[in-house]
């Protein structure tokens, strides 16, 4: 809005609007702050998903014109205006949804240049004089290390640290997992990461790892924030399992339509994507359709429950870790964006909450939950357990962790949890 200070009148310059909810990198909402500021006394900059992807725009107040400085099927992140206000610096996944690089572009939209070139991920800070960048860089199987580089195209990075990987870590051949796309039932491309067994060790069983948070990206070329699960997936592959990890509908990094694909129905299109991944494994990778399991935590735990309760012919075993079981009892600020308010959209909550579909459980379920979880409260696991008891289900178990919050901190808890998950899969997928 523009305010005429003499009259107090307001004039609309631009509007962020979404039938689902406003979000995306640099736009605001979903954990992101909004990028907006002055290029000069007559021009402002901001980010918008108006094109379907979060891009950089400028608005000239004198001519009342808007211009997109970036455009395409990619997202702009970490926007910085140079101190002389001649350039914008930014991270984007222009080359590939799972690859980030650092760019600069003139404030008039010309002369866009890529400054970093390594395949992987970057977390970048500009030096005060903007002549250098310091960044953490990582690759799929190489943890984050610190580098510096001159802030110009074609310059070579200088590695500062070599501390992330211990000698024991380096002795193991961590998989450089393949990233590829599979086609969903509606024709959309789903980005996947595949952990393949070594030749001669493959069995016909598969496990799908379901990342948490909903709006998060885990199919990418940098070191995963799910590094424990990444290590566990390597272990599963060593034992002959084929493991697949997908960026299902509502994962980050893929634009507005993907981000809002679960509006009014969590466990809808996102679960369809998991089912389509399972069918891909059977059709293309020699997997037995009776030997597919899945696991995940938080939103991934919720998805595991929905999969076992509503798709029992697809998934034969699952581990739901700290799962949401009833969205009406979860964080209002998170849920109301996606499902609206329980009082005015009860249908969305009913069809999205696993506790309403417990009767569909036919196969084997492991639930793991910390008793002092301040994110997904332990009551979710208790209420679900009571419902399972009421329905006479005997193919489930609950592992309780008395000292753990949402993110476990005790090594013994992590070890116990993953020993139970491994036992679940070995028992019910390999028989």
Regions found by a protein language model. Name each.
Residues 1, 52-57, 97-103, 142-148:
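Structural motif
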Residues 3-33, 48, 59-84, 92-95, ...:
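Multi-bladed beta-propeller domains
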Residues 39-41, 83-84, 128-129:
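Residue-level detector of Asp-centered blade-edge/turn motifs that repeat once per structural unit
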Residues 39-49:
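Loop/turn-rich, solvent-exposed surfaces of beta-rich toroidal or solenoidal domains
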Residues 43-45, 88, 133:
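Hydrophobic beta-strand positions that form the internal "hydrophobic ladder"
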Residues 49, 91-94, 215-216, 220-222:
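Short, conserved, GDST-rich strand-edge loop motifs in beta-rich repeat architectures
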Residues 49, 93, 100, 138, ...:
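Short loop/turn segments immediately following the C-termini of beta-strands
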Residues 121-431:
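Serine-hydrolase catalytic core recognition
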């Amino acid at each position: 809005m523009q305010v005429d200070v003499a009259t107090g009148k307001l004039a609309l310059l631009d509007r962020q609007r979404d039938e689902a909810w406003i979000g995306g990198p640099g736009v605001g909402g979903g954990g992101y702050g909004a990028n907006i500021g002055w290029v000069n006394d007559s021009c402002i900059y901001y980010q918008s998903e108006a094109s379907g992807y979060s891009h950089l725009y400028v608005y000239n107040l004198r001519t009342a014109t808007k211009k997109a400085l970036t455009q395409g099927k990619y997202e702009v992140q970490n926007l910085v205006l140079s101190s002389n206000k001649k350039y914008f610096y930014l991270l984007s996944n222009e080359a590939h949804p799972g690859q980030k690089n650092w760019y600069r572009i003139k404030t008039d939209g010309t002369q866009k240049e890529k400054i970093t070139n390594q395949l992987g991920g970057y977390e970048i800070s500009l030096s005060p004089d903007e002549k250098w960048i310091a960044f953490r860089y990582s690759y799929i199987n190489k943890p984050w290390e610190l580098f510096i580089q001159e802030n110009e195209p074609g310059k070579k990075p200088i590695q500062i640290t070599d501390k992330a990987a211990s000698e024991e870590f380096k002795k193991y051949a961590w998989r450089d997992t393949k990233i590829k796309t599979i086609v969903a039932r509606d024709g959309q491309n789903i980005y996947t990461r595949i952990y393949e067994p070594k030749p001669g060790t493959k069995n016909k069983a598969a496990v799908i790892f379901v990342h948490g948070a909903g709006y998060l990206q885990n199919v990418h070329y940098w070191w995963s924030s799910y590094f424990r699960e990444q290590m566990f997936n390597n272990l599963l592959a060593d034992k002959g399992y084929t493991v697949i990890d997908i960026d299902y509908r509502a994962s980050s990094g893929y634009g507005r339509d993907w981000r809002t694909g679960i509006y009014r129905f969590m466990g809808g299109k996102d679960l369809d994507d998991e089912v389509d991944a399972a069918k891909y494994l059977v059709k293309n990778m020699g997997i037995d359709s009776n030997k597919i399991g899945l696991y995940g935590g938080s939103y991934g735990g919720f998805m595991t429950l929905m999969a076992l309760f509503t798709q029992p012919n697809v998934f034969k075993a699952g581990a739901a870790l700290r799962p949401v079981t009833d969205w009406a009892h979860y964080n209002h600020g998170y849920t109301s964006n996606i499902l609206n308010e329980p009082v005015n959209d009860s249908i969305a909550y009913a069809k999205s909450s696993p506790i309403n579909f417990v009767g569909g459980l036919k196969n084997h379920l492991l639930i793991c939950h910390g008793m002092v979880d301040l994110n997904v409260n332990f009551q979710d696991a208790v209420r679900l357990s009571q419902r399972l008891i009421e329905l006479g289900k005997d193919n489930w178990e609950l592992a309780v962790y008395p000292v753990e919050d949402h993110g476990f901190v005790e090594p013994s808890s992590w070890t116990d949890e993953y020993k139970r998950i491994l036992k679940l899969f070995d028992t019910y997928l390999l028989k």
